[in-house]
Amino acid sequence: MTELRYAVRALFRNPGLTLAAILCLALGIGANTAIYSVVNAVVLRPLPFKDPERLARIYTEFPTYGSSGGFHKFWMSTPELLDLRRLTNSWTSLEAYTISGVNLSGGAEPVRVTAASITGGMLPMLGVAPQLGRLLGPDDDRYGAPLTLVLSDGLWRRAFGGAPGVIGRELKINGLAATVIGIMPRGFAFPPGETDPPELWYPQQINPNNPGGRSNHFQSVIGKLKPGITIQRAQAEFGQIMAEQGRNRTPHFHSFDPKFHTLLALPYHGEVVGSVKTAMLVMLGAVAFVLLIACVNVGNLLLARAESRHHEIAVRKAVGASMWHLARQCLIEGFVLALSGAALGLAVAWGALRLILAFNQGSIPRAEEIGIHWSVLAFTAGASFLTGIFFGLAPLAQFAGDSQESLKTATGRSTATRGAHSLRRLMVVSELALALILLVGAGLMVRTFWKLQQVNIGLDPARVITMRLALPQAQYTQLPAVKQLWTRLLERVNALPGVQSAAVLSGLPPLRPLNANDIQIEGYVKKPGGPDQNVDYDQAVSPGYFEMLHIPMVEGRAFDARDGASSNDVAIINLTMARAFYGNQSPIGRRIREDRDTPWCTIVGVAADVKNGGIDKPTGTEIYFPYSQVNGGIRALYIAVKTSGDPQRIVSAVRRRVAELDPSLPIAQVRLMEDVIAAANARPRFLTVLLALFSFVAVSLAAVGIYGVMAFLVAQRTREFGIRMAIGAEPADVLALVLAQGMRMGLTGVAFGAFGAFILTRFIRQLLFAVQSFDPLTFLSTAAILTLVIAAACYIPARRATRVDPMIALRYE
């Protein structure tokens, strides 16, 4: 205990240096722990299901079909799922789910929630257990069985106050009676990785005699491999199935085929986290650099402290202190320093993790599993301990010999050795190089985000608010009643004070699920290499939609009042579709239809492109229909309202108008159109902000490091500067001398950093948009920024050197 008290006193004889070392360690440990906790939960940790390594995501693909180079990782139709269950022997089970929004009533008030309809074996296959009640099983999934459902912990607590009595209670889902049979445990998320995760699960209850059309692809399929079966073996079996069906191929397009309609099985974990894996590993590399810079800074500080203690250690050794006693004291000081940094680092990690999760906005899958992971805290703390111990023992290196000789050496005014100076300079060069690598990475992401912001979405989102409304089929069985409600609602909303215009639409740009619907184009003959008759996106809208969002018509006209249910069917296509199927010819007056059972529609307009598959993706083909002429798919639509003032103020009035028509209908997903567009950029914005933050920390630490070294060197050369000025040197000469020394060190770090960035930035190439990994503007601007920081950090001690009084310096010596 006495040695511990002495260690604390010794450390705080120079409180500024000690606090700086603790802060450096805390920043490095805290940032590293926070990001590794995210990476560990999202990427490294297995999925929280039974035997997760045996789970696989199964897709169908159409490699040669469509107008955009084929459809990859596509959904499966229900008949295809039933076929696959019958034909394959590699899987213990093949289950499916579909995500949608549902109206849930029976609680305090109707709510719109995200739900997953699942096949009966899904939850048992995952090996999860409910916290209350039971799971959905095969009996619940039997066609015609009473409808049952399972609630998430969050929905149970939010809508029902966490009351156990909800088990057995009858609710209504989309107007159909359903009994609550179970509550899932807190933190359960299925499917994992969804931006808007389901809070309710109910059985699909597939009709075995009428499972739907083979071309109706909407099922997401997950399989569990039999023990001992690899995914490669299962894929090989898929190849046999495709080859057999391909040999017996019928004119029906949707038979499995090794060329036209393939099957693909991939590990489920990789499919859940694959979209963010690179970004997460980049973040882990970034914080590792921050930790390295922090440790280098601590090493520099402790080396400076070691040189200031030469005399103390030499005296103690001369009066009989053993090397073991001195080493033990230095070890204790190192442990105190590292423990303090680790403790503060834990607080930094906790705060950083809270900020990351708050700023997440759906950018990180499996966010519900993220928390402080103690193994990485132990690792980073251990690394810091080793750093502190190594440099804490550094003062003893020069005193391993004779005590009297050590004392003579230590009593000199200039105790720093050439080796110590070289090591210190090497450390500064290293941390500056690491800082520039981080700065370049952040600069590339800033450029990417800026480029994304400059992309023309194709519409004007100003003062537009959107909301989702769904009409349950159990209540609205007839399509004319559905269309009538939408028409009456639009009339009432358009009549509200402050509303400039209102419209309904089936899909919300700029990021929508792919439709990939077959179409028929009158007179179209496919040329070699030409597109198939298929459209990527379809959109049901009301008259006034194009005008409200300022979507220009390239040719023809927009929908208007003449395009009603009793009028001739019409359509509008986007410019991409016009070019794909009509080339340089005008499509106005040509006819098109979705399938053989629907009437022909006359194309009356060509609209400018609106982003539909993501801001960073090429615009897909798109066809618009008036909602009043559509025969299905319009029970759930978005309402878009453009106002003359703050759009948020109109929401309550719209709710009242909906309640006047049907009080059982909840409005959901109320968002400004500007926020919808911003959400499409959420992931690059998230990565940009974090990289910018880490690069700022890294540059700050590097600036502190070079400032500390230059200040120490100036202090060591006080006599030299005094003599120079005593014999006629001007202050400007001394200033230039010190700045030149610091800038040589700094520019060496910049050069090594630029080389390192050139090598490493290629690993973030897939995260960039419209920016090359070696972007000259980014490299030059970040190098210039770091050079200015270096110059500023060197100027302060250089300026101090010019103020040395020659007489005081000579008298000191």
Q: Which residue ranges define each predicted feature?
A:
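Membrane-helix entry/capping segments
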Residues: 1-17, 101, 109-112, 144, ...
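Small-residue-rich transmembrane alpha-helices
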Residues: 38, 299, 335-406, 444-448, ...
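Mid-to-C-terminal secondary-structure elements
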Residues: 115-138, 147-281, 354, 441, ...
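Alpha-helical transmembrane segments of integral membrane proteins
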Residues: 1-18, 268-273, 301-328, 332, ...
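Short, strongly hydrophobic transmembrane alpha-helices
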Residues: 14-42, 46, 293-295, 342, ...
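Interfacial "coupling" helices/loops that link adjacent transmembrane helices in transporter permeases
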Residues: 294-338, 415, 704-743, 750, ...
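Membrane-proximal juxtamembrane linkers immediately C-terminal to transmembrane helices
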Residues: 35-63, 88-90, 129, 194-195, ...
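Membrane-proximal extracellular/periplasmic loop immediately following the first transmembrane helix
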Residues: 47-101, 217-222, 456-518
